[in-house]
């Protein structure tokens, strides 16, 4: 695949309308996420021809360019540097097309027409900003925990292990314990920042959920208070409560800042915000967040244990990826981790990627030997097997529509199997909140009966997704489809 170079970034910037059209440049694991002043100035046909670009996703809030893992972050850093140099006058920017009045009118009409959808997409897109920086840590902690559990089951249980082995296992587990002990604080920081507030205020509010309020407790950090002016404190809600506190806290902070004199902003804005939000958190958010958290856990535990529900979740997941709203599942992952000790939704959703691989392989065998389609599949199938599905989605199946549908069917079949096994008494899941998909996720799988049953069920589900995705596409997804 093409590398991200300064020339690539320069071409991308020019194709989206220049630095003056880019309000914000960020990234997630695989996408360069741009907030454009006018989406009408971005030329998608030009962007798709730039080496390294796998596809484009456009919404009212963000213009997303799919580049692949690693490359998205590199491109975002280079583009921000280029924009800074252009705006400071260090370089000359190529001439950009003048903003057409009709284009502006069309853009405004589009935004007004889809205002509700845009609001939902804007809200869910914030989750990418909150959780994407944490994903490498989730993966690292999950892998270390997986290896530690593997060593434990092979060399410790029913044996007399050496002290070195015990120390090694404890050492590999400590990172996961550290991550989950203070994860709420990291999320609070990112969440309040994502919604327009100060990250440190979000971290402080999140710490209210981490502190202990029982002076007799022998673990945790006692907060120094066991009630709030006569009201009992029950730090429930976990991630849901933290997100609510940070989101509302950001709005309160912005309102306070509007009326605060500039000279007093640094001193008083955070003080007032914390005093208000502390009370709101103790009295309202913790009780409500706790009930929402409990309800979400119950809903998805029942869906995951239901073969039909699991099939629907897996079958629709690719569609949520296309619309960029799949990050909305992340709070559910936290709820399941709290309720079960592992993330039972993740392996179900991962089946969608298996269906994608199977569908793409069917297209490969249906296409002629010299077809460009075969080259496209060859370049995207390895990332697909490793859990990076976007090259297959945007480069192979989605442009041809029918194979995308049959890929969803393949994913639904794998999801049905995972749900059926769970219904029969063996729920499986990821040993961390978030992790890689595809075959890379195998070492991270676990179950109530240990890691080996979890790994075997996940592999069987993937194979079913591959096979059903392949057969559905081979026999039903290639008619009247461009295979050139």
UniProtKB/Swiss-Prot annotation:
It catalyses: N-acetyl-beta-D-muramate(out) + N(pros)-phospho-L-histidyl-[protein] = N-acetyl-beta-D-muramate 6-phosphate(in) + L-histidyl-[protein]. Residues 1-89 form the PTS EIIB type-1 domain. Residues 125-484 form the PTS EIIC type-1 domain. GO terms for cellular component: plasma membrane. It is found in: Cell inner membrane. The keyword Magnesium does not apply. InterPro entries: Glu_permease_IIB, PTrfase_EIIB_Cys, PTS_EIIC, PTS_EIIC_1, PTS_IIB_1, PTS_Sugar-Specific_Components. The active site is at 28 (phosphocysteine intermediate). PROSITE patterns: PTS_EIIB_TYPE_1 (PS51098), PTS_EIIB_TYPE_1_CYS (PS01035), PTS_EIIC_TYPE_1 (PS51103). Its main location: membrane. Keywords: Cell inner membrane, Cell membrane, Kinase, Membrane, Phosphotransferase system, Sugar transport, Transferase, Transmembrane, Transmembrane helix, Transport. Its EC number is 2.7.1.192. The EIIB domain is phosphorylated by phospho-EIIA on a cysteinyl or histidyl residue, depending on the transported sugar. Then, it transfers the phosphoryl group to the sugar substrate concomitantly with the sugar uptake processed by the EIIC domain. NCBIfam families: PRK09586.1. The phosphoenolpyruvate-dependent sugar phosphotransferase system (sugar PTS), a major carbohydrate active transport system, catalyzes the phosphorylation of incoming sugar substrates concomitantly with their translocation across the cell membrane. This system is involved in N-acetylmuramic acid (MurNAc) transport, yielding cytoplasmic MurNAc-6-P. Is also able to take up anhydro-N-acetylmuramic acid (anhMurNAc), but cannot phosphorylate the carbon 6, probably because of the 1,6-anhydro ring. This is PTS system N-acetylmuramic acid-specific EIIBC component. The lineage of its organism: Bacteria, Pseudomonadati, Pseudomonadota, Gammaproteobacteria, Vibrionales.
């Amino acid at each position: 695949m093409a590398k991200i170079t300064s020339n690539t970034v320069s071409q991308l910037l020019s194709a989206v309308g220049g630095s003056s059209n880019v309000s914000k440049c960020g990234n997630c694991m695989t996408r360069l996420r741009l907030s454009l002043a006018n989406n009408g100035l971005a030329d998608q046909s030009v962007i798709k021809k730039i080496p390294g670009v796998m596809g484009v996703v456009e919404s009212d809030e963000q213009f997303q360019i799919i580049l692949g893992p690693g490359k998205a972050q590199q491109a975002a850093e280079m583009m921000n540097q280029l924009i800074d140099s252009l705006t400071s006058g260090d370089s000359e920017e190529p001439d950009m097309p003048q903003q057409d009045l009709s284009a502006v009118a069309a853009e405004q009409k589009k935004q007004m027409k889809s205002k509700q959808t845009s609001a939902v997409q804007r809200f869910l897109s914030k989750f990418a900003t909150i959780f994407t920086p944490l994903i490498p840590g989730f993966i690292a902690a999950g892998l270390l925990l997986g290896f530690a559990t593997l060593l434990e089951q092979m060399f410790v249980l029913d044996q007399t292990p050496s002290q070195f082995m015990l120390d090694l296992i404890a050492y590999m587990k400590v990172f996961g314990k550290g991550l989950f002990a203070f994860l709420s604080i990291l999320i609070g920081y990112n969440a309040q920042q994502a919604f327009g507030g100060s990250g440190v205020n979000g971290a402080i509010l999140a710490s209210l959920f981490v502190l202990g309020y029982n002076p007799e407790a022998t673990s945790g950090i006692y907060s120094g208070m066991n009630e709030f002016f006569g009201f009992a404190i029950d730090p429930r809600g976990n991630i849901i409560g933290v997100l609510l506190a940070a989101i509302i806290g950001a709005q309160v902070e912005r309102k306070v800042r509007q009326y605060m004199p500039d000279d007093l902003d640094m001193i008083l804005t955070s003080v007032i915000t914390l005093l208000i939000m502390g009370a709101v958190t103790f009295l309202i958010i913790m009780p409500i967040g706790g009930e929402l958290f409990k309800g979400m856990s119950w809903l998805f535990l029942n869906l995951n244990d239901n073969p039909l529900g699991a099939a629907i979740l897996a079958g629709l997941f690719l569609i949520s990826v296309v619309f960029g709203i799949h990050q909305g599942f992340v709070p559910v992952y936290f709820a399941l981790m709290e309720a079960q000790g592992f993330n039972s939704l993740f392996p179900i959703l991962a089946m969608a990627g298996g269906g994608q691989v199977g569908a793409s392989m069917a297209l490969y065998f249906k296409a002629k030997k010299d077809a460009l389609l075969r080259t496209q599949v060859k370049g995207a199938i390895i990332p697909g097997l490793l859990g990076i599905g976007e090259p297959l989605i945007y480069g192979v199946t989605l442009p041809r529509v029918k194979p995308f549908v049959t890929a969803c069917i393949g994913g639904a079949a794998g999801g049905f199997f995972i749900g059926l096994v769970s219904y029969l008494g063996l729920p499986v899941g990821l040993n961390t909140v978030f992790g890689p998909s595809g075959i890379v996720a195998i070492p991270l799988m676990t179950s109530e009966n240990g890691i080996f049953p979890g790994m075997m069920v996940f592999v069987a589900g993937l194979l079913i997704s591959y096979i059903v995705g392949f057969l559905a596409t081979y026999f039903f997804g290639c008619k009247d489809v461009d295979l050139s």
